[in-house]
Amino acid sequence: MNDRPRPCSNPAMLKHNTYFEGGVQSVGFERNGRRHTVGVVDAGEFHFATDAAERMTVVSGELWAKLPGEAAFRPFASGTVFEVPAKSGFEVKALAPAAYLCEFL
């Protein structure tokens, strides 16, 4: 059995993104013709603008989000989902590092 990592078959398909001086980092990719990112939010509070609608799934840890039209942050634990409309924005904060999957709808 070979446990060595294999090189990516198409390295151009992966895009590393760094936001907020490294406070949020993600890797972007396409699957079935749709864009996705998998990332980590470090402890802190961040604002994101959206071009496309987004579905955010928390995959590890906990994120707090203030969605468009809402006055307060709500907690989203691992395994939970929230959606953000296109051409809007949302705030997210983490008390400790948390991981997410973002699907562009």
UniProtKB/Swiss-Prot annotation:
Alphabetic keyword roster: Glycosyltransferase, Transferase
Protein name: Pyrimidine/purine nucleoside phosphorylase
One Pfam entry name: Ppnp
Transferase listed as a keyword: yes
EC number of this enzyme: 2.4.2.1, 2.4.2.2
Primary role: Catalyzes the phosphorolysis of diverse nucleosides, yielding D-ribose 1-phosphate and the respective free bases. Can use uridine, adenosine, guanosine, cytidine, thymidine, inosine and xanthosine as substrates. Also catalyzes the reverse reactions.
Gene3D superfamilies reported for this sequence: Jelly Rolls
GO molecular-function term, one example from the UniProt record: uridine phosphorylase activity
Cellular component annotations (GO), alphabetically ordered: cytosol
Family: Belongs to the nucleoside phosphorylase PpnP family.
Catalytic activity: a purine D-ribonucleoside + phosphate = a purine nucleobase + alpha-D-ribose 1-phosphate; adenosine + phosphate = alpha-D-ribose 1-phosphate + adenine; cytidine + phosphate = cytosine + alpha-D-ribose 1-phosphate; guanosine + phosphate = alpha-D-ribose 1-phosphate + guanine
Annotated source species: Anaeromyxobacter sp. (strain Fw109-5)
Keyword Glycosyltransferase assigned: yes
